[in-house]
């Protein structure tokens, strides 16, 4: 449907047939022969549907502020005991204190903006392992499994976004994502008969949501205003921001009406919070996957929520459901670095919230 950059609605109404409920069952071990056999069958199906490239879109929690605690600090929110009476909230906030949750240990020293390069990805593989991270082993396993038949080759690439969790960071991330997909189109000689499958983890799904609005086929005064506002503010940065070239690339793509020869973008989000709305006219197919526990006595499973961790030790296991997906909604953005960035972010917010 047409969305035109509107914020997604927080609705309690029954989604009906648009939602399904699955129970996780233990399957075969990753990278085993049985796993490869299953991927081979899936790869043939994907290839037959036109998929030629899979993009693993992700960021990292290292050094980030997932819940906007920096802004709470500005008003003293973390110091006023506002969590009183909310089971589990105090244990969650225990990792949001200044110089604790928001920073990597001093001997690690890597924090956003992350570079989408081999060195950064290798560093994350070593320290984050597979916690919110698409590792090189996973990328290679998917590529080899899906393409086990020489007649059905499917490329698999990782795209690490900056992990700057605010409107400016995500918008620039969407520009960069489009630039890299355009590069993949040329590299693999893709056209309108092909499909690119994007698997977006967590906050990275917001980039795909913005991209769906940027690539909308219909005219959009909001899109025009966003481009003009962003370009105007970019002119004040010294040195120029690298994303300006990517913004110009999107603008030129739309002006030349190149959507007709561009591969369809199918998107699967994994635990992405409800933030930006989706314009399904600008993409192919869309699927959201959320890890919650739909246990309710009234039968309204779509209203199920996660259970907050009761102690800090429970936080990495997510036994009560995906609390990051539930809590990282509007007004939880990270603090920006400079007044000029804050000004541009505020200008974007007027059209995105």
Which positions does each model-derived feature cover?
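Acidic-enriched, low-complexity/disordered segments with a strong bias for Aspartate over Glutamate
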Residues: 1, 14, 37, 65, ...
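Amphipathic alpha-helical oligomerization segments
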Residues: 47-50
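C-terminal catalytic-base region of ester-bond hydrolases, centering on the histidine
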Residues: 55-57, 67, 89-92, 99-110, ...
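Aromatic-residue detector
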Residues: 1, 24-26, 82-99, 112-115, ...
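Residue-identity detector for threonine
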Residues: 23-26, 45, 64, 120-122, ...
């Amino acid at each position: 449907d047409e969305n035109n950059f509107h914020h997604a609605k927080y609705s309690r109404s029954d989604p009906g047939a648009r939602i399904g409920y699955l129970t996780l069952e233990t399957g075969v071990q990753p990278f085993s022969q049985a796993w490869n056999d299953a991927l081979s069958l899936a790869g043939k199906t994907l290839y037959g549907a036109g998929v030629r490239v899979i993009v693993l879109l992700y960021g990292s929690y290292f050094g980030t502020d997932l819940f906007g605690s920096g802004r709470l600090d500005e008003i003293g929110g973390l110091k006023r005991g506002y969590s009183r009476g909310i089971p589990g909230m105090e244990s969650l906030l225990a990792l949001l204190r200044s110089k604790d949750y928001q920073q990597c240990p001093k001997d690690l020293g890597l924090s956003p903006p992350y570079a989408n390069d081999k060195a950064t990805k290798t560093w994350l593989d070593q320290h984050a392992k597979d916690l919110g991270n698409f590792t090189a082993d996973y990328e290679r396993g998917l590529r080899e499994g899906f393409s086990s038949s020489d007649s059905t080759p499917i490329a698999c690439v990782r795209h690490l976004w900056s992990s700057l969790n605010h409107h400016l960071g995500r918008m620039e991330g969407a520009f960069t994502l489009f630039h890299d997909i355009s590069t993949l189109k040329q590299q693999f000689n893709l056209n309108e008969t092909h499909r690119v499958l994007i698997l977006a983890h967590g906050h990275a799904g917001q980039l795909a949501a913005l991209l769906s609005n940027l690539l909308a086929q219909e005219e959009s005064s909001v899109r025009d205003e966003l481009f003009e506002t962003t370009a105007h503010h970019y002119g004040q940065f010294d040195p120029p921001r690298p994303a300006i070239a990517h913004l110009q690339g999107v603008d030129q793509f739309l002006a030349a009406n190149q959507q007709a020869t561009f591969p369809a973008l199918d998107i699967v989000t994994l635990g992405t919070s409800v933030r930006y709305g989706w314009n399904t006219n600008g993409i192919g197919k869309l699927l959201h996957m959320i890890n919650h526990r739909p246990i309710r006595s009234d039968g309204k499973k779509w209203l199920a929520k996660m259970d907050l961790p009761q102690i800090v030790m429970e936080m990495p296991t997510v036994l009560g459901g995906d609390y990051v997906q539930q809590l990282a909604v509007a007004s939880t953005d990270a603090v920006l670095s400079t007044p000029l960035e804050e000004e541009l972010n505020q200008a974007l917010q007027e059209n995105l919230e």
